[in-house]
Amino acid sequence: LVGSEMCIRDSFSTILLYVTIAFLLLWQLPWCYNFFVVKPEKTPFTLYSFVIGDFALMGQEEGKGTVRRDAAGNIYSEAAFDSILPMFYFRQLMSDERFPDTINGIAVTPKIVQTENFNFRSVPTDINAPSIGLYPLLESMSGRVDLKMPDDVFRITSKGIEFIDMASNSVNAEKSLQFTEAMAKKDFHFPAIEIVGNPTVKKEYDEGYLLLDADRRLFHLKQVKGRPYVRAIPLPEGLTLEHLYLTEFRNKKTLAFLTDVNNAFYVLRSRTYDIVKTGIPAFNPETDAVSYTHLRAHETRHDL
């Protein structure tokens, strides 16, 4: 009887082992197939050239090396490619003394290019990474050119905002009460479900943080001469925001980029706090990596 039980256990263990191996094979076979059979696709670097009115592409081609062409198939030398993308290669054109005075009849200068151009990048790892929930609030109007990191950090709880002195690890009750009352007066409902800023001194100016309160309403919070600045930002009818990106670009025309629960993309303008829906295709920040480059010498009504 004992021998029979041992045989049954051995048989069960063997069956379980084979089943486990089968599941592992089913799980790994698609990956192995893709690894050994599927060739990686090389997506060419692509920008729109308003000089030629078409897309310009640069990529590696087998036996040819780096090839620069437009969507119509015309091939360009490296210097010619620089010329049809003057807003992107303006440093090279300046070095070669080939930067144009006008583009499509519009006067341009290197200063305008540096001010108006920007890059925006969003990757899922930034969105999905866990947060420690402690944020430094810089002084936005210190009167000095260089920004300075504060001696404290803040967190937002269900009761309010707390400022914690990093040296003593103690709560600054007076400052916490001052900011909590300022936020409550603007009808901020604690806690915050989204807190977004750029806590670094390696930027030209500071706009503090954008917040979504417990009801997903949008607020702007910053510190101005030691006092709280809180602005409730009205949302268009039916808009429910999901993710926020504080921009702090050089031209100061844009305060933030926003996405809603349907992954549509919006611009929050500075000063007016107007929210404008863009024509950029929807993307899910939690799963999709995107990169946008704004290369315009002048502003139009449809610019970001």
Tell me what each language-model feature is.
Residues 188, 195-237, 247:
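Secondary-structure-rich domain cores
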Residues 31-55:
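Alpha-helical transmembrane signal-anchor/signal-peptide segments
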Residues 54-77, 82, 86, 91, ...:
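Short beta-strand elements that form the blades of beta-propeller/WD-repeat-like
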Residues 1-11, 293-300:
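Conserved small/polar residues in nucleotide/adenosyl-binding loops
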Residues 111-132, 163-189, 220-235, 264-283:
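Surface-exposed loop/turn elements that mediate protein-protein interactions on large endomembrane-trafficking
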Residues 14-31:
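Hydrophobic membrane-insertion alpha-helices, especially the h-region
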Residues 136-144, 190-199, 239-248, 281-292:
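Repeated scaffold domains used in trafficking and secretory/extracellular systems
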Residues 274-304:
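Membrane-proximal extracellular "stem/stalk" segments
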